[in-house]
A protein has these predicted regions:
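Short helix-kink/termination motifs in transmembrane helices of multi-pass secondary transporters
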Residues: 1-2, 71, 75, 137-138
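Short extramembrane helix-to-coil loop segments that connect adjacent transmembrane helices in Major
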Residues: 2-6, 147-150
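Short loop-to-helix capping motifs
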Residues: 3, 83, 120-121
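Small-residue-rich hydrophobic transmembrane alpha-helices
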Residues: 7-73, 105-124
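Amphipathic, positively biased hydrophobic alpha-helical segments used for protein targeting
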Residues: 14, 37, 58, 124, ...
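Short runs within selected transmembrane alpha-helices of multi-pass transporters and secretion channels
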Residues: 25-28, 97-117, 123-132, 139, ...
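Short alpha-helical transmembrane segments in multi-pass integral membrane proteins
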Residues: 35-101, 143-168
Length: 168
């Protein structure tokens, strides 16, 4: 069973991860505004070219930020006064966050920035809802209560929904 150490690790990992992902929230919002403006002007070709540019930019920045998050694990661990076991748990969890930043931020820009700006909000909502309630929550339940897996594996299982969303 996971305890206070796991809760601390998830809190720290989520906060650090958010620092690396904030750039993508800006990219997603910028793409929504720029693409939405072009679609409103009935300039679909320019909106499409913006979408392609934003996706390429997201992919390139995503690689850099994922590697930076992975490499910063040691610095993050040094900030906190955790025991050795918790430090290992934090390092492993940050590694999972770094790996899953790739599909997560790509789908964020794709869904929140590009598809929603084009009016495809129902598809985005359904994919988000199904991802969380059909994939993420059941896998977390199985990982914690049935299989008693380590924290980083449970986090990876929950984030698996991002690969599924990327497929659609």
């Amino acid at each position: 069973m996971l305890g206070a150490s796991a809760l601390a690790v998830v809190q720290v990992a989520s906060t650090v991860n958010d620092l690396f992902q904030i750039l993508f929230f800006g990219i997603g919002n910028a793409s929504a505004v720029m693409i939405g403006n072009e679609l409103g002007r009935r300039n679909e070709d320019k909106a499409y070219s913006y979408a392609v540019v934003f996706l390429k930019m997201t992919f390139a920045i995503n690689l850099v930020m994922s590697v930076a998050l992975f490499l910063s694990r040691g610095m993050v661990i040094n900030i906190y006064d955790f025991d050795q076991e918790t430090n290992i748990m934090l390092a492993n969890t940050l590694a999972v966050y770094a790996i899953y930043m790739l599909p997560k931020m790509f789908t964020y820009v794709l869904f929140c920035g590009i598809l929603r700006s084009g009016g495809d909000t129902r598809f985005c909502m359904l994919l988000d809802l199904l991802g969380v309630w059909v994939i993420g929550v059941p896998l977390a339940f199985l990982g914690v209560l049935v299989f008693h897996l380590p924290l980083h594996i449970i986090v990876a299982m929950v984030f698996f929904e991002e690969w599924v969303k990327l497929y659609f």
